Swiss-Prot record:
Biased composition (Low complexity): 101-113, 128-142, 775-785
Pfam families: VPS51_Exo84_N
Sequence intervals crossing the membrane: none
Ranges annotated as biased composition (Polar residues): 114-127
Coiled coil found in the keyword field: yes
Protein name: Vacuolar protein sorting-associated protein 51 homolog
Covalent S-S links between cysteines: none
GO biological process: endocytic recycling; Golgi organization; Golgi vesicle transport; lysosomal transport; retrograde transport, endosome to Golgi
Keyword terms: Coiled coil
């Protein structure tokens, strides 16, 4: 029997009936795992694998036969227990017993066959039915049990008590459980009357009557069917008895005829034995020569298949004969055939790999190539990688061609993109699973399957990310948020149809979330980019129109235009964000609105942090640390500080109003409560003001450096830079006029952007600040009198301190400025005078030089008093005069009357010139 089954049937029988892997099979039935795997893939050379499969086949059939015989014996016992006994039992299928015997019989049946009680034969059901019927009839005549009790006893007699899903102890002992053994009619009746209305009671009555009638009909039908089968069984038994009577004579006749046939067969065999052996020999030779003929023609057949691209047929030819060729490879002719076939198959493999990698190969041809290579037992890793590489390259080329197309309407483009990519993507996933995952059902390589799944996941993610990047890049080129939402909805609906293919690596939720979040990031990134462009455009305008912007209100208009442009960009941002929460247009986003809203709030906070603490202040870092500081003038910083002042007074209020409107729209469109972050407008105004003041401080420091350069240049402008041999002074040096003119320019510039405070209303607070500043300078002055290092090496001291003088003085000695013209100008002048004082410490003066500086300082004192109407700078000017006196080799102060006369003459001359002009 085992010799009659073919190898192909053995393989099919293995896959159909064996549920474990080849390793478990070899441990149970013997053989080698590699040999078994090759045998299962079509290489039938392994005798051990064939013997193991036949052993499995024989054992399986033997078990089935034993189970069948055991079932026949059980049926016979059941038949005897049901219909056996005396002759009286042959007349009727109804077994009349007493109630006690019926109950006992039912219990015994349940105990002995409890494990198969749900699969009883109809004969046992007939017995149970007859027992229950007789019991019910007897009880009804004596005690008058209701019909429902009779039906319940009938079913319980057949199935046995306590069998079923709902047979737990609590429900079985419930007196209100109509199917339980503890059922109490009176309690059930009282309970249902109390808990039900009249209509419900009538409905319950009709239901129970219908169930009773149905069960009665089923029981009668069951009894009739079993009675019919019983009659048929008795007829069969009678026929069997009749036929058995003549069986002995028939067997004797059959034995006689068999002996005659045996004698004739022996005579024929003895007569034809010689010829039969010859015929068998010739028949075997014919079959052998036919095989040899096919083997000799195998190379030409393979070449023909290769030319016709019938690769599957070539693989079948090769695999079916490779075993014979290997078996007789020691014979030269067979060795030549095998070498030629191997060469042809190698050529075919190369062509298959080439076709697999070609972009022009169709989807079906690509799958066929991979399948044929797998049938040729090529390494799975190599075929898998080549297949994925080919399909990935083909799909990416498709996406790149779509990416290059111009887009007029984003919705139409997304539809075309989905139609091309998603169909290709779905086919790739399905074909890959059929080739490398589902194909591995018969192998024991769980690691191989896992590796295939991981590579499929990477393949899918790469392609899907490329697809999403193209969609996002195209979406970013459109400004209409409504059209973007429609495009996202198309992506959502189309990708949702591929849920099964995406389940292993990408969820539709992640796709929508990432797309929407990226779109939100784009809005905010674009806002930051636009603000940077506004600021750079502002700086370019200031550099190109240096003089024009100072005419009229051009500077203020430029500042206001930049501020309003930034606010308009913020307004546009909220307009772009609102469609995400409009329920009539974004139904598919309803489940994502809470995360979208949280994302927007976080991005808003990051934006204000960027605007206040990062973007505006980064220009200060550029000016302080990079070589590009020259492209940002002090005027640019002044305008930037005025923009901060605008945001503090108006911009923040408008932004808060826009945010409140946006939150209202979001709450109306959301299906559940949104978590709204607290927005501290006063704190934001404070931060904006602090940023503006920092910028204004840097502007003040840069402006003071210009004044400081003028004063330092005046110190270096004397002949030979020698203050010891200077001629007797007779006038104020011209550098002081240049210094005052530069101050007037700063005043004109700052007054166009910052509020102007009346000089006469300048509070005493400025004088107190000046006094404190004077004290600090005096302390520094006294400390400079200690080791006289400046006197010994003034040039070295100058080179080491000139770069950081203004910064150090500004940080330690000058109060922070405020948003008004007077505060800024006072800070600029004070810082320049402090720096000038430090420069005086590095010089050595003669008597005339000391007198010249004394005259210059007195002239500045008078001029600054005329400008500001206060004595804010007297202490600083006095400190400068004290420094010159200390640095003079022969300090003889010039008479105050002479100083006053020279300065008054200069002042009058200056006023006359101004009046004439």
């Amino acid at each position: 029997m085992s010799q009659s089954i073919s190898d192909i049937k053995l393989v099919k029988f293995y896959y159909r009936h064996y549920k474990l892997g080849p390793q478990d099979f070899c441990r149970e039935y013997g053989g080698n795992v590699d040999g078994l795997n090759k045998f299962l893939t079509g290489n039938y050379d392994s005798l051990a694998a064939r013997d193991a499969l036949r052993s499995f086949w024989e054992r399986f059939n033997t078990n089935q036969l034993m189970k069948s015989q055991a079932g026949d014996e059980d049926d016979g016992d059941e038949f005897n227990s049901t219909f056996g006994g005396g002759d009286s039992m042959l007349l009727s299928p109804i077994k009349v017993t007493s109630p006690m015997s019926s109950s006992s019989s039912s219990t015994n049946t349940t105990n002995s066959n409890g494990q198969i009680i749900g699969n009883r034969s109809f004969s046992s059901l007939a017995e149970a039915t007859s027992n229950a019927t007789t019991t019910t009839t007897s009880t009804t005549t004596t005690g008058g049990k209701p019909e429902s009790k009779r039906v319940r006893n009938l079913l319980k007699t057949y199935y046995g008590p306590g069998i079923g899903e709902g047979s737990d102890s609590s429900s079985m002992n419930d007196p209100l459980n109509i199917d339980g053994p503890s059922f109490n009619l009176n309690s059930y009746f009282d309970s249902i009357v109390k808990s039900s209305t009249l209509n419900q009671l009538i409905q319950k009555d009709n239901q129970m009557v219908s169930e009773i009638r149905t069960l009665d009909g089923d029981m009668k039908t069951l009894v009739y069917d079993n009675y019919t089968k019983f009659i048929n069984a008795t007829d069969i038994i009678k026929k069997m008895k009749t036929n058995v009577e003549n069986m002995e004579e028939g067997m004797a006749l059959l034995s006689k005829n068999m002996d005659l046939i045996t004698n004739c067969s022996e005579k024929i065999n003895s007569t034809l034995s010689v010829r039969r052996d010859r015929i068998d020999q010739l028949s075997g030779l014919q079959k052998f020569f036919q095989k040899l003929q096919f083997l000799t023609a195998l190379p030409s057949s393979l070449n023909h298949c290769l030319a016709m691209q019938a690769y599957n047929q070539a693989v079948r030819y090769y695999n079916s004969n490779s075993g014979i060729l290997k078996q007789y490879s020691h014979i030269p002719s067979f060795q030549n055939i095998q070498n030629e076939c191997d060469s042809i198959m190698k050529t075919m493999k190369d062509k298959l790999y080439e076709r697999l990698s070609s972009l022009s190969t169709s989807q079906t041809d690509c799958v066929e190539s991979a399948e044929v290579l797998m049938d040729l037992l090529e390494p799975v890793e190599l075929v898998r990688s080549k297949y994925l590489e080919s399909r990935k390259h083909h799909t990416i080329t498709l996406l790149e061609n779509l990416e290059k197309k111009s887009v007029e309407h984003i919705t139409d483009y997304i539809k075309e993109l989905n139609a091309n990519f998603l169909s290709e993507y779905s086919y790739n996933i399905t074909s890959y699973k059929s080739l490398f995952i589902n194909r591995l059902d018969g192998s024991d390589s769980k690691k191989e399957r896992q590796q295939s799944l991981l590579q499929l996941e990477d393949f899918s993610k790469d392609l899907f990310n490329k697809y999403l990047n193209i969609a996002k890049s195209k979406l970013s080129s459109f400004k209409d948020p409504i059209e973007k939402i429609m495009a996202l909805e198309i992506i959502n609906s189309d990708v949702s149809r591929l849920g099964s293919e995406l389940s292993s690596h990408e969820k539709i939720t992640n796709i929508i979330n990432s797309t929407v979040h990226d779109q939100i990031d784009f809005y905010f990134d674009n806002l930051q980019k636009t603000i940077k462009e506004h600021i750079h455009q502002l700086n370019s305008t200031l550099n190109e129109r240096r003089d024009e912007v100072l005419e009229g209100h051009n500077l203020q208009e430029l500042s206001d235009a930049t501020s309003k442009a930034i606010v308009n960009d913020i307004i546009l941002l909220f307009a772009n964000l609102k469609p995400f929460f409009l329920p009539t247009e974004t139904q598919f986003l309803s489940s994502y609105q809470d995360t979208i809203f949280t994302k927007i709030q976080v991005k808003l906070q990051q934006f204000f942090l960027f605007l206040v603490n990062i973007h505006f202040l980064e220009y200060l870092d550029i000016i302080a640390t990079t070589s590009n500081r020259e492209q940002f003038s002090g005027r640019f910083l002044l305008v930037l500080s005025s923009i901060c002042l605008y945001f503090e007074n108006k911009g923040i209020t408008l932004v808060v109003q826009l945010m409140s409107e946006f939150i209202t729209v979001a709450k109306q469109g959301a299906k559940k409560e949104l978590n709204v972050f607290s927005f501290n407008a006063p704190d934001l105004c404070k931060r904006v003001r602090e940023t503006g003041l920092q910028i204004l401080n840097v502007f003040t420091r840069l402006s003071s450096q210009k004044l400081d350069k003028i004063l330092k240049k005046g110190l270096e402008s004397i002949p030979n830079n020698n203050w010891l041999v200077l001629k007797e002074p007779r006038d104020v040096r011209s550098v002081n006029d240049i210094y005052l003119e530069e101050i007037l320019k700063f005043q004109n510039e700052t007054s166009k952007l910052l509020p102007v405070i009346n000089h006469h209303h300048h509070s005493l607070k400025s004088h107190s600040r000046t006094g404190s500043g004077g004290n600090s300078v005096s302390s520094n002055n006294s400390s400079s009198n200690t080791p006289d290092g400046h006197r010994r090496n003034p040039s070295a001291s100058s080179s080491s301190s000139s770069n950081n003088t203004n910064t150090t003085l500004f940080e330690k000695k000058v109060d922070h400025v405020d948003f008004n013209t007077l505060s800024v100008l006072i800070a600029i002048i004070k810082l320049s005078l402090k720096s000038f004082n430090e420069s005086l410490r590095l010089k050595t003066f003669g008597t005339n030089g000391c007198h010249q500086i004394q005259i210059d300082l007195h002239y500045l004192k008078l001029s600054l008093y005329d400008l500001f109407g206060s004595n804010s700078f007297d202490n600083l000017l006095q400190e400068c005069e004290n420094t010159v006196t200390e640095r003079c080799v022969d300090p003889l102060p010039l008479a105050k009357s002479i100083v006053s006369k020279i300065c008054e003459t200069k002042m009058n001359k200056k006023k006359n010139n101004e009046a004439e002009s």
